[in-house]
Amino acid sequence: MKKIFDTTFTIKEVVATGIGAALFVVIGMVSIPTPVPNTSIQLQYAVQALFGVVFGPIVGFLTGFIGHALKDSIQYGNPWWTWVLASGLFGLVVGLLKNYLRVAQGVFESRDIITFNVAQFVANALVWVVIAPLGDILIYNEPSNKVFAQGVVATVANGLTVAVAGTLLLIAYARTQTKSGSLKKD
C-alpha cells in the first residue's frame, strides 16, 4: 500500500518549497482581471500543481500557502487568510496525485492527463466554491453572494488555467524523466 503522506521532509523538498513559493509570488503578480471584483485569472496555480505532483502534498500545500501569503502581503499589505489557506489546500489535494501519476517515471499520457484534470477541477471547486467563501463569511463577515460569485469565477478560471498550463508543464516535465527500460546496452 502506498503512503499518502511521507513524514520525512528532505532538503530537496525544502528547496522545492522555496522555489515554488517564490515562483507563486512572481507569476502571481501577473494576473488577468475578470468582471468579478478581486478575482482574476492567475497562472501560478499551474506551477503550484506541477510542484505538488512532482514533490507531493506537503510541498504543494506550502508552495501555495507561503506563496499566496507573501503575494498578498506584497500586493495588498496583508494576506487574506481564507484564500491563502484555500491556495495551500489546492496544492495539498493535487499533491496527493504524486503516488498515482507516473510523471517521475517519464509517463504522462491520456489516462494520467484525465486523472490529473479531474482531480484538479475537484480540488479547485472544493477550495474556491466551499472553503474560501465559507471562511470569508465566517471570519471576514463578507456578503455571501459576493464570495460565492468570486469562488465560482476562481474555480472556472483556475481550473481552465491548470488544465491547459498545468497539463503542458507536466507533459514537459515527464519528457525530461528517463522511462524505465528505455536505456539499452550497446
UniProtKB/Swiss-Prot annotation:
Gene3D superfamilies named among the record's database cross-references: 1.10.1760.20
**Cell location:** Cell membrane
Give any Gene Ontology cellular component.
plasma membrane
Keyword Oxidoreductase included in the entry's annotation:
no
Highest taxon in the source lineage: Bacteria
Q: Write down the membrane topology.
A: Multi-pass membrane protein
Q: Which HAMAP family does the record cross-reference, listed alphabetically?
A: UPF0397
Keywords, in A-Z order: Cell membrane, Membrane, Transmembrane, Transmembrane helix
Q: What is the lineage of its organism?
A: Bacteria, Bacillati, Bacillota, Bacilli, Lactobacillales
- Coiled coil (UniProt feature): none
Q: Which Pfam families match?
A: ECF-ribofla_trS
Protein name per UniProt: UPF0397 protein SGO_0469
Belongs to which family?
A: Belongs to the UPF0397 family.
The transmembrane residues are 14-34, 50-70, 77-97, 119-139, 152-172
